């Protein structure tokens, strides 16, 4: 494994104690009418979460507070402390005076006792202590976190036994003789709404019952597949209870349309819950409500469960590590041109492009320069489910049936009708203080204002959802939004996903630029995130391509065999099934990641098959093998199980269906209700296709074992930072202060 540390800038922590004040006055005339009820407001405009205040003290001209506050400061900014003395009143609080103090005067680790004069007679006494932040709440590294490394070791021992069990009748030379020979296997599920979720449920049943699931180290999902993974891994009886039983629960849940949850009494409950989130200072969009709908449909008894709580399913290596994904996108830029992949696991959330990760409980909190300045509760799993599948909140008009369109139009065609600025907006000017009015109003007046604001916001949300759907044409209603956890960081350079970039042979220019669907695809993927934007937008990863390959192509994970299942929509059942895989290949090559050559002409030579195998070129020791399953009804029409023909009219009728060709197909990407027959057909089809190719999977596992044996240092990365050609994002600022030693 490599030990690559991504450079980041240090910050200062200011500890400020408001000690006391002397001779607080409202002026000669004001003092005759009333004795002040003073409190102090503090502000450092150059830092987030910059407004803080003491309690007020009644009728005291010499108040003593002794209250301590903290600010995270950028030492390269001209930071100025603004101190405002206030008088609390029943209606509107009164400003008594303001003083400023330049924080550049402070020296690290030296306490300063500061006296500020306000007016002619009033003094405010402060204690200021400046510290260097010795650690941050973000982890800056390309390596896997310690928890995942420990998981991999524990899981490897279990996988070794499981592979021996799966291949028990094989020649011993095909079995791993040591943990080093155990291949790392990843299972992938694509997006595709409930079609992907139901199809993946059949896949997982087959993999679980055949023993292949126990041989996998990772399960990665995107959009609809993440919904199934969320339901499976959050189930209290999983993994002791397998997908076979759990899928019956899923069938019952999807037999009712989740839109029935849009009854006024439910919506009112959702929106009021979201007001609490908004009033605490977190951004709220329609993705939050969509996540509630998906959660109430799939995990109704587990709405409070968190991503981090899924660690209990994997800590002993008893199940593959689940990986989920979304995209960070920019305003006014197509997701196909620019997108940063965000990965989620029960251990960490982050972006490998920047080597920046955090614990799941911190995602959504306010950060500055790598440190949390305001922490919120961990988001519930259903919120993340809404983010991971947010294409459907973006296209909710279509889901509702509000927009008239042809049933054959694809999600891509629908999204082309929506300009990027309607999905996301520029948040650089967002007012982070929108819910923090500080001391300008009395407590009673503030409470009344909050009640009116809540009522107004709830009414607007209800009207938008139940009425004219204006919510869907504004940036507020489109994409998920969270506080920017990279706010204030210094992106001088970034490390490529691949530690071999710039050292191995360069991909040919022709391979670099060949378009799969659009000449502009991935054109701007080397650009950096905007570290000045206070919030970032996070959307469905399927908006760039519909397979979560970036998660498991990280060289640190050392994946040998990828078993991917693509449930993406195609124009017809007979259409070539490689579009998403070709996009994944192009993305990998642009990031210098090992990826087998995808020969799309295999479709012309061999026709439509249940799965295709793509192997690395001879001598390529670090490239994974890919088994790519597609959504196709071929042998299932005639066989109810591998080798078992259909022998009754009822059986034959059950297996005789198309997925994309039928005009009234229940398998539309936008269908959120599956009757039992539609569910069983798709579920059983993908279970059959998987079981029908178990021998293909076994052969690939054997090949991976032999490759590991022949290349014991496979995927071992020991390159130093100086050996890697960094991609320059921004010119280095020579004025950046060096961290003191």
Curated annotation (Swiss-Prot):
Domain (PLA2c) ranges: 132-729
Subcellular location: Cytoplasm; Cytoplasmic vesicle
The record's account of how the chain is modified after translation: Activated by phosphorylation on a serine residue.
Annotated catalytic residues: 223, 540
SUPFAM superfamilies xrefs: C2 domain (Calcium/lipid-binding domain, CaLB), FabD/lysophospholipase-like
Enzyme class at the top of the EC tree: hydrolase
PROSITE patterns (alphabetical): C2 (PS50004), PLA2C (PS51210)
Boundaries of every C2 domain copy: 1-116
Keyword set includes Metal-binding: yes
Region Phospholipid binding: start-end pairs: 1-172
Domain remark from Swiss-Prot or TrEMBL: The N-terminal C2 domain associates with lipid membranes upon calcium binding. It modulates enzyme activity by presenting the active site to its substrate in response to elevations of cytosolic Ca(2+).
PANTHER family named among the record's database cross-references: CYTOSOLIC PHOSPHOLIPASE A2
Protein name: Cytosolic phospholipase A2
Source organism of this protein record: Danio rerio (Zebrafish)
């Amino acid at each position: 494994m490599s030990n690559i540390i991504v450079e980041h800038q240090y910050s200062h922590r200011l500890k400020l104690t408001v000690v006391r004040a002397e001779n607080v006055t409202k002026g000669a005339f004001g003092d005759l009418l009333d004795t002040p009820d003073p409190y102090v407001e503090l502000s450092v405009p150059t830092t987030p979460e910059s407004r803080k205040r003491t309690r007020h003290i009644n009728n005291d001209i010499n108040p003593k507070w002794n209250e301590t506050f903290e600010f995270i400061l950028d030492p390269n900014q001209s930071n100025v402390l603004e101190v405002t003395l206030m008088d609390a009143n029943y209606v509107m609080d009164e400003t008594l005076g303001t003083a400023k103090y330049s924080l550049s005067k402070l020296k690290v680790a030296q306490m300063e006792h500061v006296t500020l004069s306000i007016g002619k007679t009033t003094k405010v006494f402060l204690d200021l202590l400046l510290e260097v932040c010795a650690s941050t709440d973000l982890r800056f590294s390309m390596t896997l976190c310690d928890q995942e490394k420990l998981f991999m070791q524990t899981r490897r021992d279990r996988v070794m036994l499981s592979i021996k069990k799966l291949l028990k009748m094989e020649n011993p030379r095909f079995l791993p003789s040591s943990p080093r020979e155990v291949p790392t296997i990843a299972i992938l599920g694509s997006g595709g709404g409930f079609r992907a979720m139901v199809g993946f449920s059949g896949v997982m049943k087959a993999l679980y019952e055949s023993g292949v699931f126990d041989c996998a180290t990772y399960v990665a999902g995107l959009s609809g597949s993440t919904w199934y993974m969320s339901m499976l891994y959050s189930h209290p009886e999983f993994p002791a209870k397998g997908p076979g039983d759990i899928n019956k629960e899923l069938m019952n849940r999807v037999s009712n349309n989740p839109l029935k949850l849009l009854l006024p009494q439910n919506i009112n409950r959702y929106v009021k819950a979201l007001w609490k989130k908004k009033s605490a200072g977190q951004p709220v969009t329609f993705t939050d409500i969509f996540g509630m709908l998906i959660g109430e449909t799939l995990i109704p008894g587990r709405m409070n469960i968190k991503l981090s709580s899924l660690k209990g399913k994997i800590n002993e290596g008893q199940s593959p590590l689940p990986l989920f994904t979304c995209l960070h996108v920019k305003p006014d830029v197509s997701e196909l041109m620019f997108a940063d992949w965000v990965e989620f696991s029960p251990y960490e959330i982050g972006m490998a492009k920047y080597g920046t990760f955090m614990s799941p409980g911190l995602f959504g909190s306010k950060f500055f320069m790598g440190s949390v300045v305001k922490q919120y509760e961990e988001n519930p799993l259903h919120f993340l489910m809404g983010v991971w599948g947010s294409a459907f909140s973006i296209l909710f008009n279509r889901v509702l049936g509000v927009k008239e369109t042809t049933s054959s139009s694809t999600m891509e065609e629908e999204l082309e009708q929506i300009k990027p600025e309607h999905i996301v907006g520029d948040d650089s000017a967002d007012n982070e203080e929108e819910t923090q009015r500080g001391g300008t109003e009395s407590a009673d007046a503030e409470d009344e204002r909050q009640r009116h604001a809540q009522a107004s916001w709830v009414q607007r949300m209800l009207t938008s959802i139940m009425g004219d759907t204006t919510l869907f044409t504004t940036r507020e209603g489109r994409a998920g939004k969270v506080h920017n956890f990279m706010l204030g960081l210094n992106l001088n350079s970034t490390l490529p996903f691949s530690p071999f970039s710039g050292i191995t042979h360069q991909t040919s220019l022709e391979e670099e630029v060949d378009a799969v669907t659009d000449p502009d695809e991935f054109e701007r993927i080397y650009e950096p995130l905007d570290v000045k934007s206070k919030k970032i937008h996070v959307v469905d990863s399927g908006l760039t391509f519909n397979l979560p390959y970036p998660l498991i192509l990280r060289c640190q994970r050392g994946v040998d065999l990828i078993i991917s299942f693509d449930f993406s929509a195609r124009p017809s059942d007979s259409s070539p099934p490689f579009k998403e895989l070709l996009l994944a290949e192009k993305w990998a090559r642009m990031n210098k990641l090992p990826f087998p050559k995808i020969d799309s002409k295999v479709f012309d030579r061999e026709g439509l098959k249940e799965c295709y195998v793509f192997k690395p070129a001879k001598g390529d020791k670090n490239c994974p093998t890919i088994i790519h399953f597609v959504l196709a009804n071929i042998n299932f029409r005639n066989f109810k199980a591998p080798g078992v023909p259909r022998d009754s009219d009822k059986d034959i009728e059950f297996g005789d269906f198309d997925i994309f060709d039928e005009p009234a197909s229940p398998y539309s990407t936008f269908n959120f209700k599956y009757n039992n027959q539609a569910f069983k057909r798709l579920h059983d089809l993908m279970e059959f296709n998987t079981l029908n190719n178990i021998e293909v999977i076994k052969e690939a596992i054997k090949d991976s074992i032999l490759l590991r044996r022949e290349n014991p240092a496979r995927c071992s990365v020991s390159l130093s930072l100086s050996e890697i050609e960094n991609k320059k994002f921004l010119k280095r600022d020579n004025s950046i202060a060096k961290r003191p030693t």
